[in-house]
Amino acid sequence: MKTNHREIKSYLVIINSPKGSVENDNEEFISLTLSAGTIISGITYVNIKQFNRNTLIGKGKLQSIKKDIESTDIDLIIFNKDLIASQERNLEKFFKHPVIDRTRLILDIFAKRAQTNSGKLQVELAQLKHLSTRLV
Protein backbone atom coordinates (compact mmCIF):
# COMPACT_ATOMS: atom_id res chain seq x y z
CA MET A 1 0.00 0.00 0.00
CA LYS A 2 2.24 2.76 -1.21
CA THR A 3 1.36 5.89 -3.09
CA ASN A 4 4.06 8.04 -4.61
CA HIS A 5 6.74 6.14 -2.65
CA ARG A 6 5.22 7.31 0.63
CA GLU A 7 3.89 4.90 3.19
CA ILE A 8 0.22 5.21 3.95
CA LYS A 9 -0.73 6.29 7.45
CA SER A 10 -3.71 4.32 8.67
CA TYR A 11 -6.14 4.62 11.53
CA LEU A 12 -7.57 1.32 12.75
CA VAL A 13 -11.07 0.79 14.06
CA ILE A 14 -11.13 -2.52 15.90
CA ILE A 15 -14.63 -3.71 16.72
CA ASN A 16 -14.97 -6.27 19.47
CA SER A 17 -18.27 -8.12 19.38
CA PRO A 18 -19.42 -10.54 22.09
CA LYS A 19 -18.46 -13.49 19.88
CA GLY A 20 -14.92 -14.56 19.04
CA SER A 21 -11.48 -14.55 20.60
CA VAL A 22 -10.90 -10.82 20.82
CA GLU A 23 -7.21 -10.68 21.70
CA ASN A 24 -5.99 -13.04 18.95
CA ASP A 25 -8.23 -11.43 16.33
CA ASN A 26 -6.98 -7.95 17.23
CA GLU A 27 -3.31 -8.98 17.11
CA GLU A 28 -3.86 -10.66 13.74
CA PHE A 29 -5.58 -7.56 12.33
CA ILE A 30 -2.77 -5.28 13.49
CA SER A 31 -0.23 -7.67 11.92
CA LEU A 32 -2.19 -7.67 8.65
CA THR A 33 -2.18 -3.89 8.61
CA LEU A 34 1.57 -3.77 9.15
CA SER A 35 2.05 -6.46 6.46
CA ALA A 36 0.27 -4.18 4.02
CA GLY A 37 3.05 -1.66 4.56
CA THR A 38 1.01 0.95 6.38
CA ILE A 39 2.05 3.00 9.36
CA ILE A 40 -0.51 2.78 12.16
CA SER A 41 -1.16 6.35 13.31
CA GLY A 42 -3.98 5.51 15.69
CA ILE A 43 -6.26 2.76 16.95
CA THR A 44 -9.73 2.84 18.45
CA TYR A 45 -11.28 -0.19 20.12
CA VAL A 46 -15.06 -0.38 19.99
CA ASN A 47 -17.01 -2.81 22.17
CA ILE A 48 -20.33 -3.41 20.51
CA LYS A 49 -23.41 -5.46 21.27
CA GLN A 50 -25.45 -4.60 18.20
CA PHE A 51 -24.26 -3.32 14.82
CA ASN A 52 -25.66 -0.11 13.33
CA ARG A 53 -26.81 -0.97 9.81
CA ASN A 54 -25.87 2.47 8.43
CA THR A 55 -22.38 2.89 9.88
CA LEU A 56 -21.65 -0.33 11.81
CA ILE A 57 -20.98 1.69 14.99
CA GLY A 58 -23.00 4.26 16.92
CA LYS A 59 -22.99 8.06 16.61
CA GLY A 60 -21.10 8.67 19.85
CA LYS A 61 -18.19 6.48 18.82
CA LEU A 62 -18.23 7.97 15.30
CA GLN A 63 -17.86 11.46 16.79
CA SER A 64 -15.06 10.27 19.07
CA ILE A 65 -13.15 8.72 16.14
CA LYS A 66 -13.70 11.81 13.98
CA LYS A 67 -12.26 14.02 16.72
CA ASP A 68 -9.31 11.63 17.04
CA ILE A 69 -8.52 11.59 13.31
CA GLU A 70 -8.82 15.35 12.96
CA SER A 71 -5.78 15.69 15.22
CA THR A 72 -3.88 12.89 13.46
CA ASP A 73 -2.24 12.84 10.04
CA ILE A 74 -3.88 9.84 8.33
CA ASP A 75 -4.56 8.70 4.78
CA LEU A 76 -6.87 5.74 5.37
CA ILE A 77 -9.26 4.27 7.93
CA ILE A 78 -9.33 0.47 8.20
CA PHE A 79 -12.12 -1.48 9.91
CA ASN A 80 -11.46 -5.00 11.17
CA LYS A 81 -14.99 -6.10 10.22
CA ASP A 82 -16.48 -6.46 6.76
CA LEU A 83 -18.49 -3.45 5.65
CA ILE A 84 -21.37 -3.43 3.22
CA ALA A 85 -21.22 -0.86 0.43
CA SER A 86 -23.62 1.61 2.06
CA GLN A 87 -21.71 1.51 5.35
CA GLU A 88 -18.43 2.16 3.54
CA ARG A 89 -19.94 5.14 1.67
CA ASN A 90 -21.54 6.55 4.82
CA LEU A 91 -18.30 6.25 6.78
CA GLU A 92 -16.22 7.85 4.01
CA LYS A 93 -18.69 10.72 3.79
CA PHE A 94 -18.67 11.20 7.56
CA PHE A 95 -14.90 10.94 8.08
CA LYS A 96 -13.87 12.55 4.76
CA HIS A 97 -11.19 9.87 4.40
CA PRO A 98 -11.07 6.61 2.43
CA VAL A 99 -12.39 3.64 4.41
CA ILE A 100 -11.62 -0.02 3.75
CA ASP A 101 -12.52 -3.24 5.52
CA ARG A 102 -10.59 -6.38 6.44
CA THR A 103 -11.39 -8.13 3.14
CA ARG A 104 -10.07 -5.23 1.06
CA LEU A 105 -6.95 -5.10 3.23
CA ILE A 106 -6.26 -8.79 2.63
CA LEU A 107 -6.85 -8.45 -1.11
CA ASP A 108 -4.43 -5.51 -1.21
CA ILE A 109 -1.78 -7.62 0.54
CA PHE A 110 -2.28 -10.46 -1.98
CA ALA A 111 -2.08 -7.99 -4.88
CA LYS A 112 1.16 -6.57 -3.57
CA ARG A 113 2.74 -10.01 -3.19
CA ALA A 114 1.44 -11.80 -6.30
CA GLN A 115 4.36 -12.65 -8.56
CA THR A 116 3.11 -14.83 -11.42
CA ASN A 117 0.77 -13.58 -14.11
CA SER A 118 -1.76 -16.20 -13.06
CA GLY A 119 -1.55 -15.09 -9.43
CA LYS A 120 -1.91 -11.43 -10.37
CA LEU A 121 -4.98 -12.21 -12.49
CA GLN A 122 -6.58 -14.25 -9.71
CA VAL A 123 -6.05 -11.43 -7.22
CA GLU A 124 -7.39 -8.87 -9.68
CA LEU A 125 -10.48 -11.01 -10.23
CA ALA A 126 -11.04 -11.27 -6.48
CA GLN A 127 -10.62 -7.50 -6.12
CA LEU A 128 -13.10 -6.85 -8.92
CA LYS A 129 -15.63 -9.22 -7.35
CA HIS A 130 -15.25 -7.41 -4.04
CA LEU A 131 -15.57 -3.99 -5.69
CA SER A 132 -18.58 -5.09 -7.73
CA THR A 133 -20.59 -5.28 -4.51
CA ARG A 134 -19.87 -1.57 -4.04
CA LEU A 135 -21.38 -0.49 -7.36
CA VAL A 136 -24.63 1.40 -7.11
Map each language-model feature to its residues:
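N-terminal accessory targeting/assembly segments
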Residues: 1-108
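Extended, highly charged alpha-helical segments
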Residues: 105-136
